[in-house]
């Protein structure tokens, strides 16, 4: 991702104060209509448990502005110094936060594609996904909104290095970021302007 920078300084200063090197920071987004009500409540309950059970974990929840989501999240998670509740961030802030994070928990479709590019395991807070290839290749895992399942899968990634490595180093089904180079090579070869073989993406 071209938006990611190694020494990125966030515009939102609270993000600059987080100890990414010594803490396992989990980035969270959850706002889909299907999760309104009991789903969001369960997610929040699970997040509280994850923080309680893991002293080296901090959460950054980018909270949707819809009161149906925001009110529940702030009521259940507000006031915990290791849970940072922030408004949605722009693309560059979000990508760099994701890059500095340990893992991602989300019900967003886009993040299921973006996080694997950065080697970040994704727990999907839904029972189904439009990205079944990500599940197949092991870059994401469906956990739904069941409290115990969310906590169990999160704790496994937090405390089991082998499980974390398996997801973070899984083959990314969405490519390697070199599609435009391959297209250019293919066009040049088609018009006999180059004899370079096109490097195909191999999953």
Where are these regions (language model features)?
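Nucleotide-activated sugar donor-binding and catalytic core shared by glycosyltransferases
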Residues: 1-61, 66-203
């Amino acid at each position: 991702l071209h938006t990611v920078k190694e020494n990125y300084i966030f515009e939102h200063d609270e993000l600059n104060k987080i100890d990414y090197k010594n803490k396992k920071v989990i980035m969270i987004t959850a706002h889909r209509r299907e999760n309104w009500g009991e789903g969001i409540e369960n997610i929040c309950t699970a997040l509280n448990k994850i923080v309680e059970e893991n002293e080296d974990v901090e959460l950054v929840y980018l909270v949707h502005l819809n009161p149906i989501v925001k009110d529940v999240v702030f009521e259940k998670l507000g006031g915990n110094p290791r849970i940072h509740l922030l408004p949605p961030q722009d693309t560059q802030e979000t990508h760099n936060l994701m890059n500095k994070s340990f893992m991602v928990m989300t019900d967003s479709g886009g993040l299921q594609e973006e996080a694997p590019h950065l080697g970040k395991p994704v727990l999907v807070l839904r029972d189904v996904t439009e990205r079944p290839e990500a599940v197949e290749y092991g870059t994401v895992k469906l956990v739904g909104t069941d409290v115990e399942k969310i906590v169990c899968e999160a704790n496994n990634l937090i405390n089991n290095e082998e499980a974390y490595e398996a997801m973070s180093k899984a083959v990314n089904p969405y490519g390697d970021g070199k599609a435009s180079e391959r297209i250019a090579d293919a066009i040049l070869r088609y018009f006999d302007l180059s004899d370079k073989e096109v490097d195909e993406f191999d999953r």
